[in-house]
């Protein structure tokens, strides 16, 4: 059967409609979540094998070719023909189809919008619904995970894979994502009269969505759907609704919540800066403080500018002209005889001190009282130039023209130049402090009585200066030792001399002097230790009665049973040993002192025993029990300190090495300790453990004597550099107080045994009496109060008071001076 061209065109038109309906149905199906293939073939969505897809494609292509061949021919039409005729016929058909398609499009574009209906886009031959059409087909869903493998056909029939849509997330970059409507930069008004509004990425038309009625718009505003904005999307023509993600984002912003779910607002806090010391530095260094405070360098620059403006070094432009005019005016009126203008000196500039103005004694015609007598002139000339109060002698001239030139002007200028060059200048700021506030509040001396205030008795009789004195334990007898070689005993109340013994014959021996005398503290004996030269004499003065004198001599004689009389025992010597060192080990240490019986002449002077040492003995101090006494020989090296035992006639040296020049040594009042005073240090030794307990640092250049408080926790020391040092043994090794009241070397210091008094005597001829209270409370410091300054001894050869001693019970003080007298000071 042969069809005409008109029939063919009608058939082609119907085919176009069928294809359009199929395209619409295919779009509806593809918009669903599950994508389907409905070309008559069955595709297994669960299979991932490429061979299955290839076979499915071949079936689809074969079925399409069969259907097209069936549609293109009738049962009665001939199939045979030449290839050329077939090709010509196909070409004609294609041209006819294109022409018909263009005509239909032109007709559609020319029609109005209201002429389109559903029947124009429906299939006339088959009016069944899509569900019935698909009922006879086998369909399988393709999961979303395999949506990338869904394949369709292009317009020429070749297969194409439809890739899944890109779902942008927060971290993705969607700046290059193409929109659904790909018309480009063309105004949408060009599609106002068309059923579609553009084309998608696949080149298919995007049909204009149907518009609702006014009632629907009103209902939409009343019952707002989720994501409703009331706006119209110009690209799609539909209402612009917000997605759930956008609604969630807006809700979080309104609630001030975290927008990004990947950020944890409650993550654990990392303490970068802790109290624990880290090895490696932390990179998160905090901002330095200088970022938040004003800059010091800028402040300095600003102050420099301000100072320059104040000083006139920076002049504003408006004042510069005035200054120039004023300067020109001043140049015409210059005061030749005017004073020079003073310039502002630098802050670090220190002017040289001005010379003192001349006084009346420097006048060429001074008053008569300023002129020196011949005796004063001779005394001035004998003095050293450094000791003179003035470096010139006042002279009187009749007139000014008779005054000669000053011969010392060059020397004075030179000395002033040296002073300015060598002496540093210091600016001292005066402090406005009330001097009375610096004086500590001390109790009145009237409230601290009794203490010695006057001289009651003078013990005169010695022909040389009295170097030492001592009071016996009973407090009735005073012993003195003088450079005349005699020891005298005085009755303290009457000042009567009751005993005299010549120890040193000054005619034959002028080198030895009586250095010290000390009574034995035991009241049952009457022993007097006298140190003269290298010997120590123990005397028993016949003033105490038979019983006391007998006990004294008996105590000395009992020691002869332990005396070796110079025969020293040697250590055991091994005769079978050939070692040369054995003989050295068997040798005995040299004897440090000898206990000898007195000669007949010495016995007549009541000398009981004589102890001979190596060097001159300067100090003697008894132990409180009266059996031991210590002697000091400054020139004897490591044997400077010797401890003598009266009951055994034994002498031993406690030290093996010399600790400097020893000046004094005394026992602790009740502990087995020995205080050793050298020139600069005071050391305290424990005799029982034979260890050094403490070392005191007085800070003096040359110590002279020491004395220990009866409680044993405080000590005073005197020095030749005019200082008295109080040491608290419970505190530091440095002095608690330093007293500087004397003008010359301090010779003696001493504590009272019962009362809170102590004194110091010096070569200036004065004795200072102090009140010293030591509290039982360890938290309170000792109270030191100056009480009285006693004067009465005369100076002889720059020597004043040489020794002092307190009465055992009363507040009386005995002193020995270089004026050959001893004095008793009472209350």
From Swiss-Prot:
Pfam families per the UniProt record, alphabetical: BOP1NT (PF08145), WD40 (PF00400)
GO biological process per UniProt: maturation of 5.8S rRNA from tricistronic rRNA transcript (SSU-rRNA, 5.8S rRNA, LSU-rRNA); maturation of LSU-rRNA from tricistronic rRNA transcript (SSU-rRNA, 5.8S rRNA, LSU-rRNA)
Source taxon at top rank: Eukaryota
Region Required for interaction with NOP7: start-end pairs: 291-409
Keyword Repeat in record: yes
A molecular function GO annotation: ribonucleoprotein complex binding
Family under the similarity heading: Belongs to the WD repeat BOP1/ERB1 family.
Protein name (record): Ribosome biogenesis protein ERB1
Organism encoding this protein: Eremothecium gossypii (strain ATCC 10895 / CBS 109.51 / FGSC 9923 / NRRL Y-1056) (Yeast)
């Amino acid at each position: 059967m042969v069809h005409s061209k008109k029939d063919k065109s009608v058939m082609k038109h119907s085919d176009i409609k069928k294809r359009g309906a199929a395209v619409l149905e295919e779009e509806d199906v593809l918009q669903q979540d599950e994508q389907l293939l409905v070309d008559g073939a069955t595709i297994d969505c669960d299979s991932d094998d490429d061979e299955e897809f290839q076979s499915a494609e071949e079936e689809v292509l074969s079925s399409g070719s069969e259907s097209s061949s069936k549609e293109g021919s009738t049962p009665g039409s001939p199939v045979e023909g030449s290839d050329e005729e077939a090709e010509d016929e196909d070409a004609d058909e294609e041209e006819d189809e294109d022409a018909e398609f263009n005509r239909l499009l032109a007709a559609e574009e020319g029609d109005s919008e209201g002429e389109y209906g559903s029947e124009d886009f429906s299939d006339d031959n088959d009016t069944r619904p899509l569900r019935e059409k698909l009922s006879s087909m086998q369909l399988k869903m393709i999961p979303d995970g395999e949506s990338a493998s869904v394949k369709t056909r292009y317009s020429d029939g070749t297969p194409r894979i439809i890739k899944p849509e890109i779902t942008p997330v927060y971290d993705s970059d969607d700046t290059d994502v193409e929109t659904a409507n790909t018309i480009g930069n063309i105004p949408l008004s060009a599609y106002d009269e068309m059923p579609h509004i553009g084309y998608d990425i696949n080149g298919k038309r995007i049909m204009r969505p149907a518009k609702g009625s006014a009632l629907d718009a009103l209902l939409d505003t009343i019952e707002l759907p989720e994501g409703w904005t009331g706006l119209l999307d110009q690209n799609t023509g539909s209402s612009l609704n917000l997605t759930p993600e956008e609604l969630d984002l807006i809700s979080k912003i309104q609630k001030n919540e975290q927008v990004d779910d990947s950020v944890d607002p409650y993550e654990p806090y990392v303490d970068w800066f802790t109290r624990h010391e880290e090895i490696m530095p932390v990179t998160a260094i905090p901002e330095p403080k200088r970022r938040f405070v004003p800059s010091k360098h800028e402040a300095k620059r600003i102050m420099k500018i301000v100072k320059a403006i104040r000083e006139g070094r920076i002049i504003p432009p408006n004042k510069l002209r005035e200054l120039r005019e004023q300067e020109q005016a001043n140049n015409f009126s210059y005061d030749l005889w005017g004073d020079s203008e003073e310039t502002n000196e630098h802050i670090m500039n220190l002017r040289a001190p001005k010379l003192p103005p001349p006084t009346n004694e420097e006048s060429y015609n001074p008053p008569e009282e300023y002129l020196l007598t011949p005796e004063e002139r001779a005394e001035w000339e004998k003095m050293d130039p450094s000791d003179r109060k003035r470096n010139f002698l006042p002279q009187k001239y009749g007139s000014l023209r008779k005054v000669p030139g000053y011969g010392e002007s060059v020397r004075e200028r030179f000395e002033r130049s040296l002073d300015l060059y060598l002496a540093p200048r210091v600016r001292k700021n005066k402090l406005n402090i009330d001097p009375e506030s610096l004086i500590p509040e001390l109790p009145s001396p009237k409230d601290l009585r009794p203490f010695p205030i006057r001289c009651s008795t003078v013990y005169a009789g010695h022909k040389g200066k009295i170097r030492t004195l001592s009071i016996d334990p009973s407090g009735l007898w005073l012993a003195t030792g003088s450079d005349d070689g005699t020891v005298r005993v005085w009755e303290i109340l009457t000042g009567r001399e009751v005993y005299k013994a010549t120890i040193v014959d000054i005619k034959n021996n002028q080198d030895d002097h009586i250095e010290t005398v000390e009574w034995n503290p035991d009241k049952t004996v009457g022993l007097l230790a006298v140190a003269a030269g290298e010997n120590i004499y123990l005397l028993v003065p016949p003033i105490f009665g038979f019983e006391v004198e007998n006990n004294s001599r008996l105590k000395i004689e009992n020691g002869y049973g332990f005396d070796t009389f110079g025969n020293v025992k040697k250590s055991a010597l091994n005769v079978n040993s050939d070692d040369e060192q054995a003989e050295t080990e068997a040798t005995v240490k040299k004897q440090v002192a000898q206990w000898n019986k007195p000669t007949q002449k010495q016995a007549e002077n009541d000398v009981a025993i004589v102890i001979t040492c190596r060097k001159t003995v300067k100090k003697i101090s008894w132990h409180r029990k009266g059996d031991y006494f210590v002697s000091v020989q400054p020139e004897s090296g490591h044997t400077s300190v010797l401890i003598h035992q009266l009951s055994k006639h034994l002498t031993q040296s406690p030290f093996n090495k010399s600790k400097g020049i020893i000046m004094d040594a005394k026992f602790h009042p009740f502990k087995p300790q020995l205080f050793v005073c050298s020139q600069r240090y005071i050391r305290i030794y424990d005799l029982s453990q034979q260890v050094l307990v403490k070392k005191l640092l007085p800070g003096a250049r040359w110590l002279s004597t020491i004395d220990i408080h009866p409680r044993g926790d405080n000590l005073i020391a005197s020095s030749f550099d005019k200082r008295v040092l109080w040491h608290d043994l419970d505190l530091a090794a440095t002095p608690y107080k330093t007293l500087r009241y004397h003008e010359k070397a301090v010779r003696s210091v001493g504590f009272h045994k019962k009362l809170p008094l102590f004194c110091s005597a010096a070569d200036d001829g004065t004795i200072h009496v102090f009140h010293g209270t030591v509290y039982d409370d360890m938290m309170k410091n000792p109270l030191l109060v100056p009480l009285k300054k006693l004067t009465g001894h005369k100076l002889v050869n720059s020597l004043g008071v040489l020794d002092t001693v307190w009465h055992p019970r009363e507040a009386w003080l005995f002193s020995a001076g270089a004026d050959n007298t001893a004095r008793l000071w009472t209350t």
